[in-house]
Amino acid sequence: MSEPKRSIMWFRRDLRIGDNPALLEAIAAGEEIVPVFILDKKLIESAGTKHLAYLGRSLRLLDESLNNSLHVMVGEQSEVLRELMKRYNAATVHISTEYEPYGTARDQRVEAAGIPLVRTGSPYAVAPGRVVKPSDATPYKVYTPFYRSWSIHGWRKPAETPKNIKCVKPNESDRNFPDWQLPEGASITAAGEKAALARWKHFQENGLDNYDEARNLAAIDGTSKLSAHLKWGEIHPRTLLAPLGESKAHDTFRKEIAWREFYADVLHNNPHTDKEYYAPRFAEMRYNQPDEKFQAWKDGKTGYPFVDAAMRQLVHEGWMHNRTRMVVASFLVKDLHLEWQLGADFFMEHLVDFDVASNAHGWQWTAGSGTDASPYYRVFNPIEQGKRFDAEGDYIRRYVPELAHLSATSIHEPWLHTDIDTNNYPPRIVDHAIERLESLDRLKEIKSDKPQDPRA
């Protein structure tokens, strides 16, 4: 009796069963599939502990969805895949296409080693490189026209969920599930496809219709909190886009998804910008060297309560509100005069939802050096941002308990209230008003008030 026809499904950033075109192709290509996740030593070495703990949980939950058939392998990718193809007589390896620099190079190496990769779908509603200017077919460098073309391009409806997946049962030696533990005291969001779908359902029922008004308020549950699920492909952006209507709130949410896709497109077309300045002249600016002030920023002890609350949330939960990401980034670059890469690396170390494109270009947007960037002369005021987006101080009280007893009128500027005990909360490490002017002076030195074309 001949062996059944088999195909390999190589999971990477698509840890789900539903709306997974690559998985459907793998199922269609054979009578049985060999599901595999290959632990990448290089990525593991650079990842933070919370990021890895989340991934470990997600892999076990994916395994449950595959009836305990997920191969979790350690080794060089082409060697692992070649061994599996030989062992199971599998003809094809199915993947979702990756577009980030590392993933692209990895897949090219695997193919160069003679492993046939069948690409179907990607982590995006519209794959990077597909949305181009109709006039000359070049990539967009500004978000707004990109968004218009992205919307016109459109996307497929969510793919069906397979009902009966026949998988090859792995050997025990192929079940190398990592035991990555959270740091003591840390707490992260629930992982897995089921948690992603449950969170999406909750957000649709409780937050989506008010998203345009609530998304910037740090103290409330006003955002989708789906970023980690999107990072690991536990839910696909198609699933989020499909039910959206034309209301202002729904359109605002759709635009936030488009920002993620825009940054992926920018990095795909400018792969060096994960570490380098998109606008090179900003590399010429005078920057300070990291010192104890940088450490205070990392520790959430800058003396600015809104900044400190955000940094403590990041370290404790591996997540931070998008509004506060911008505020702490501006503080690092424009109050402490440090290069954005230092902050981006710290985010990489702690964010559960770390995504190289969104992280690098989110930082460059705030720093003023990126495409479609916030002008460098725009400096977020950490005091006014707190008053505006945490007016009652509830967010600060949650993460800076030293100040929990302060009133809404005093919690944002505790240094003005010397008669109140602040439980050894640190004094300000810089004066924002002074450092804002210093940033503008340094900007004048490079004689630019906005980023220029990186190829100029």
Language-model-detected regions and their locations in the chain:
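Trp/Phe/Arg-rich N-terminal binding region typifying the photolyase-homology
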Residues: 1-158, 249, 358, 441-446, ...
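Short, contiguous strand/loop micro-motifs
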Residues: 9-10, 49, 212-213, 297, ...
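A broad detector of short, well-ordered amphipathic alpha-helices
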Residues: 24, 308, 433-437
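Short coil/turn segments at secondary-structure junctions
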Residues: 46, 294, 423-426
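Residue-level preference for long, well-ordered alpha-helices that form the structural scaffold
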Residues: 51, 55, 299, 303, ...
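Glycine/tryptophan-enriched, flexible segments
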Residues: 136-282, 389-456
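Active-site-proximal binding-pocket segments
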Residues: 221-402, 408
